[in-house]
Amino acid sequence: MTGSAPNPDADAVAWGDLLAGSYREIGERAMRDLPIYNDALGVEAVGFRAFNGTIVGIMVTPWFMNVVLPASAVAQATSGATARIRFPAGDIEFTISEVGQIGRIASCSLFSPMFQFADMDAARATAEAALAELMLPADSEEAVRRREPATTPIDRRNFLRGTLTERRG
């Protein structure tokens, strides 16, 4: 038998692409002429994947970068405009909103506006890194190592001379 194995994230990627299409339309219709619009960027769904029975990924637009998931992932009993969702890295607060043809989504803002990004490569790399951090368990060896302070203090004289030679953690 030939062919490839089914991609478990195919539905997630498709949903992310559909959401990106809605944001492209919003960008052209309502955002392009606003001062928060970064012309160097486009709209892209980054890293969309299956997660705990739902979909999660990062939406990059010329005016924001958000972690997003379908609002159906939020318990129906939840009322109000926000919800806390558990990720391996910890609980994250999301805002519930409506997006065009997609309907209700839950989003968590990472950046807005987006002027600190010179191009899509920089924005995409940041989105990928943010999603990786979100999926890293807070008590994992890697997460603990990243939180540890430097093993030696910085020598002030060398710092002021611009000759730091100490090994940092």
Swiss-Prot record:
Signal peptide (from-to): none
InterPro entries noted in UniProt: NiFe-hyd_HybE, NiFe-hyd_HybE_sf
Pfam families per the UniProt record, alphabetical: NiFe-hyd_HybE (PF11939)
Domain of life per record: Bacteria
Family stated for the protein in its record: Belongs to the HupJ family.
NCBIfam families with a match to the protein in the record: hydrog_HybE
Protein name, per record: Hydrogenase expression/formation protein HupJ
Organism: Bradyrhizobium diazoefficiens (strain JCM 10833 / BCRC 13528 / IAM 13628 / NBRC 14792 / USDA 110)
Lineage: Bacteria, Pseudomonadati, Pseudomonadota, Alphaproteobacteria, Hyphomicrobiales
This protein's encoding gene: hupJ
